[in-house]
Amino acid sequence: MYHTVPYTIESPGYLKVAGESLPRRHPRAKHGLLRYPSAGVLTVFDIVRRSAKLYPDNKAVGSRRLIKMHREFKIIQDKEKEWIYYELGPYNYLSYSQYELLAIQIGSGLRKLGLSSSNKVYLFGTTSANWISMSHGCASQGIPIVTGYDTLSATDIQHSLSQTHAEVIYLDPHLLGTASIALENSQVKTVIINTGSIFSGGYDIDQFRNEHPQFNVITYEELIQLGRHNLKEPIPVKSSDLFCIMYTSGSTGLPNGCCITHENFLAGITGLLGGIDDFVSDQERVLAYLPLAHIFEMALENLVMYIGGTLGYGNPKTLTDASLRECNGDMVEFKPTIMVGVPQIWETIRKAVLSKLNCSGFVAKTVFWTAMSFKSFAVRYSLPGKGVFDDLVFGRVRQMTGGRLRYILNGSSGIADSTKEFLSLIVAEMLTGYGLTETCANGALSSPFEQTTSAIGSTSPAIDVKLVSIPELGYFTDADAGPCQGEILVRGPAVFKGYFNNPQGTEKAFAPGGWFKTGDIGEFDDRGHLKIIDRIKSLVKMQGGEYIALEKLESIYRTSQAILQVMVHADFEYTRPIVIIMPNTKFLQDKSRELGFSDDDSTLSSERMSAYVLDDLQDIARRSGLSKIETVTGVVITDIEWTPQSGLVTPTMKLNRRFILNYFRDEVEKCMQSIG
């Protein structure tokens, strides 16, 4: 079933333009870019209707209920700290026929509240079956939704509420504090509270209602009841109508709202489906836990519903049993066949495996690495027997993720080739994807039927892609020698309509002819696959005039067992970069004992500890073939957790560079000065 080279073709009807490559597209789009997944599916709610008809008894969505919150107290660095553990029940499911009725009831309830297509509903909560059902309930009545990450500040929420004039907000109870501030001076009239959230404990809804008498405060269940007693048929919606205003999680300034029509979103799903439909079926079980306010997660979940698969809702805190009591983690309980994650998730799994392996005896280590070498060789040369060690040697690792995974998919940002190969061999084959909010998650996607190494994969059949030279950075599409490289520009039905109430930003985002400028640098390899080099904003010119790619270096240095998060920092005044890291405290403490460090040297702030981490990173640089100017010369070890709540990373775990530099300004300046 392997696909044939080239994996992308030149798009018909274009003339060669100096400084640009000819646009390329997926072979499936040879006679025209794809817009809709199938006949009759022209709006988002059509996905639900179709699956309810074709797969009425299939399990659509599954959720776990909170049984009990366990509170434990531990002494950490001479201070008592409270730890919260969750006890969850088994997954309970709704069939597709039940889910369709639920969405209609939600839409009917919103209509009874007086909403129509001229109003907007703001969704502000963690990923859950209730969140996605709210989006489909809105779609059934042509009501546009506005999405906001549950980690956004009150200022950001206030900005998007004010800009969109949303009159209804749906939120989780633990976000009432943030919402209370954000709702001031907004046009919100009704607050819908999702009491089904596992994080709902300890938040007084009645108190919120009493303190805010200006709002009509109801629960998610009460909205369903309202719709059940006032049923309305879904209304006709045009594919050109607005489906969603999705606010990006950018790390600079206030977030932009991307206007996405039903046609845009369906084209995005169609593009993704075109890359995977030959290896998925209605038997797929996909664990849903990434933010639904992110385009890739929202597109993925709707795609799973389109094919009749099952969504099992989880949370990053409950994926494993580390934060649970008396129950399994989501992965073991749900047993997914496909799982999507970001680099930090995959690096955490890899490091956990290596940590346990390092505690094993000589024989166990030898067996593991021998099996790894054999399977790697068999995969590289397509030899039989590559799965012979899967149960014997890698079985325990696979059981950590439920034991049924066929594919894992990395999104959000780049991942080191070594990590991709490691997890592909011991867990499940890793696929990689590239896309943006503005392109409805479309860009490029790898396939198990297309051999590739460092490239992402073939482009989506819903878009054309071209490269434009960036002479000032040394990237050219028509160089006499060397690859065709340049900024990635995208055009097609999956591309959004523009930024909400921001005509200047929209104009700046597009090149003539409707080509969206991604800000990413790419290359088409000789197989037709798209390779991502870096973001234009992540390229830094060094003192000697050469450029280094920060995100590329971070994906490599992130493989160190000594660190959990890393940001590479470079400056024109210096010849080489430094790193700012969130340390793997347990690993470093164990390593300091192993190396015989004194108590003073074992602290994270000691010079000896910094020297050990720096030596480790420089060794990784040598083994990865990095140049001298790409090799770090200093390290800043931080003492705060890098989470969206701390502001150091975005909700999709991308680095918030400006915030990090400002937060650790003194330490960074001291480190830079020390290296000269």
From Swiss-Prot:
Gene name of this polypeptide: FUM16
Protein's pathway: Mycotoxin biosynthesis
Biological process, per Gene Ontology: long-chain fatty-acyl-CoA metabolic process
The protein's name in its UniProt record: Palmitoyl-CoA ligase FUM16
Endpoints of the signal sequence: none
InterPro entries: AMP-dep_synth/lig_dom (IPR000873), ANL_N_sf (IPR042099)
Cellular-component GO terms for this entry: endoplasmic reticulum; lipid droplet; plasma membrane
Family: Belongs to the ATP-dependent AMP-binding enzyme family.
UniProt entry keywords in alphabetical sequence: ATP-binding, Endoplasmic reticulum, Ligase, Nucleotide-binding
AMP-binding as annotated region, ranges: 552-655
Traits of the deletion mutant: Does not affect fumonisin production. Increases the production of ceramide intermediates including 3-ketosphinganine, sphinganine and phytosphingosine in comparison to the control. Causes growth inhibition in both solid and liquid media.
E.C. designation(s): 6.2.1.-
Residue ranges of the TM segments: none
Superkingdom assignment: Eukaryota
Amino-acid positions noted as binding AMP in the UniProt annotation, renumbered to this chain: 245-256
The protein's enzyme class: ligase
Any GO molecular function: ATP binding
Compartments reported by the entry: Endoplasmic reticulum
One Pfam family here: AMP-binding
Function (record text): Palmitoyl-CoA ligase; part of the gene cluster that mediates the biosynthesis of fumonisins B1 (FB1), B2 (FB2), B3 (FB3), and B4 (FB4), which are carcinogenic mycotoxins. Plays a role in the synthesis of ceramide and is involved in self-protection from fumonisin B1 toxicity. The biosynthesis starts with the FUM1-catalyzed carbon chain assembly from one molecule of acetyl-CoA, eight molecules of malonyl-CoA, and two molecules of methionine (in S-adenosyl form).
